[in-house]
């Protein structure tokens, strides 16, 4: 068996011979986490059985379970953790009934995953990468010195292999584990967003935006940190690899370098892929929100407005409208439903005018401007045209009029100032504060 890995059959046989197994329901897992937190607060790291019973009682209170026979149930839970090699029990004839307990490496690893490993930030990643860079730098310097002095295998194992194996590789594994925790965090955020949108999407839009932006920012910040250090780390690994090329007795270092390069590539690659996947999900959520808003606008708001009109005399209200022609649509629909004749005349500002007629009028006016340009060589001031035209239409038509004029202006020509990169000044085009930023069209 090589020193850097184990084969699958060997690992299977090893686990089978030792009868490894894990069975941690929520209550047992919470008990283990409580033990780990309590253990961190102690200086000696040792716990008595009475301490564990008190911890068990506290966790059962959180689950609102009965405290009957609490000592027996706590003893059963402790024995299960000992059997699964999560706790070690130490006792002797001198300490009968006063056993001492310590968390095993497995217990520390499981609790560490749920407690400390979730504290993942760009600062922590930067510190880890800084430590890795220092270790690889020392290893590469030692490798070059070993080549110059023709050092023995013992030198290479102590000064090159050991730092890479027991420091760099473990930090890479820690970063990889942190990325997998970030994957879980993304899934939990997706579930939270789905739950928010299912319950009340109107109130949840701001919360969804915050969750999406925070996650996108975290992923981008972490990936930028990885990209900044990745190339330098790869260069140092290549320095070490160049030193062991052709040295059959140092095959274990060459193989370790290859493994580290693969780990680093995988970490950086998955970081970028996670960002791309999250961007796709972000777009999907925004599309869903836009669709939901459109559906609500057509379905809920119109029904609410009809009910308000129907009960107007019982509950009077004021109506502020931004598009007056919508009242005409509502009036026509009511007339069809009731099959009654509408009496009276609409105010002038509510008279219906088709968009095609409006378009033809504006096109005709723009053609007149072209004739003036051809005869007098007079440029077209788009802001002045917009201001003059908007004065002839009600406020409800201003957006459509402005859109048609701008569309026609783009077809007519362009401004020389556009090519020079000069930004035009903002010009007011109506009394409601609307402004436009456009150069004078002087090139056709």
Swiss-Prot record:
A molecular function (GO) term: calcium ion binding
Name of the protein in question: Chromosome partition protein MukF
Compartmental location: Cytoplasm, Nucleoid
Gene Ontology terms: cellular component: cytoplasm; nucleoid
Originating organism: Haemophilus influenzae (strain PittGG)
Region Leucine-zipper: start-end pairs: 212-240
Subunit structure, interactors included: Interacts, and probably forms a ternary complex, with MukE and MukB via its C-terminal region. The complex formation is stimulated by calcium or magnesium. It is required for an interaction between MukE and MukB.
CDD domains with a match to the protein in the record: MukF_C (cd16337)
Keywords of the record: Calcium, Cell cycle, Cell division, Chromosome partition, Cytoplasm, DNA condensation
Gene Ontology terms: biological process: cell division; chromosome condensation; chromosome segregation; DNA replication
Highest taxon above the source species: Bacteria
């Amino acid at each position: 068996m090589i020193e850097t890995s184990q084969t699958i059959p060997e690992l299977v046989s090893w686990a089978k011979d030792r009868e490894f197994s894990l069975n941690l329901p929520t209550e047992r897992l919470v008990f283990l986490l409580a033990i780990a937190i309590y253990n961190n607060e102690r200086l000696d790291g040792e716990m008595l059985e009475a301490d564990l019973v008190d911890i068990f009682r506290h966790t059962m209170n959180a689950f609102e379970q009965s405290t009957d026979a609490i000592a027996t149930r706590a003893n059963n839970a402790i024995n299960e953790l000992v059997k699964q090699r999560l706790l070690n029990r130490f006792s002797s004839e001198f300490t009968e009934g006063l056993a001492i307990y310590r968390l095993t490496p497995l217990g520390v690893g499981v609790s560490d995953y749920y407690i400390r490993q979730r504290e993942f930030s760009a600062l922590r990643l930067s510190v880890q990468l800084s430590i890795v860079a220092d270790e690889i730098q020392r290893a590469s310097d030692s490798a070059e010195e070993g080549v110059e002095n023709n050092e023995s295998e013992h030198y290479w194992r102590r000064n090159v292999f050991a730092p890479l194996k027991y420091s760099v590789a473990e930090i890479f594994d820690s970063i990889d584990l942190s990325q997998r925790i970030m994957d879980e965090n993304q899934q939990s955020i997706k579930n939270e967003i789905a739950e928010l949108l299912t319950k009340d999407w109107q109130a949840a839009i701001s919360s969804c935006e915050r969750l999406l932006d925070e996650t996108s920012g975290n992923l981008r910040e972490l990936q930028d940190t990885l990209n900044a250090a990745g190339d330098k780390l790869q260069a140092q690994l290549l320095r070490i690899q160049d030193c062991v090329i052709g040295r059959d007795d140092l095959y274990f270092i060459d193989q370790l370098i290859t493994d580290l390069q693969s780990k680093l590539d995988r970490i950086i690659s998955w970081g970028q892929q996670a960002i791309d996947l999250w961007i796709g999900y972000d777009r999907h959520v925004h599309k869903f929100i836009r669709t939901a808003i459109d559906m609500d606008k057509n379905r809920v708001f119109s029904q609410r407005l009809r009910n308000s009109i129907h009960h107007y005399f019982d509950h009077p209200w004021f109506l502020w409208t931004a598009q007056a022609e919508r009242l005409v649509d509502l009036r026509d629909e009511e007339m069809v439903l009731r099959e009654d004749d509408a009496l009276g005349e609409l105010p002038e500002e509510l008279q219906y005018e088709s968009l095609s007629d409006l378009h033809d009028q504006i096109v005709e006016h723009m053609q007149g401007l072209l004739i003036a340009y051809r005869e007098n060589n007079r440029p077209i001031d788009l802001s002045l045209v917009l201001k003059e035209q908007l004065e002839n239409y009600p406020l409800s038509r201003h957006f459509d009029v402005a859109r048609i004029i701008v569309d026609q202006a783009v077809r007519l020509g362009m401004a020389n100032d556009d090519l020079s990169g000069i930004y035009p000044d903002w010009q007011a085009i109506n009394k409601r504060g609307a402004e436009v930023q456009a150069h004078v069209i002087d090139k056709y």
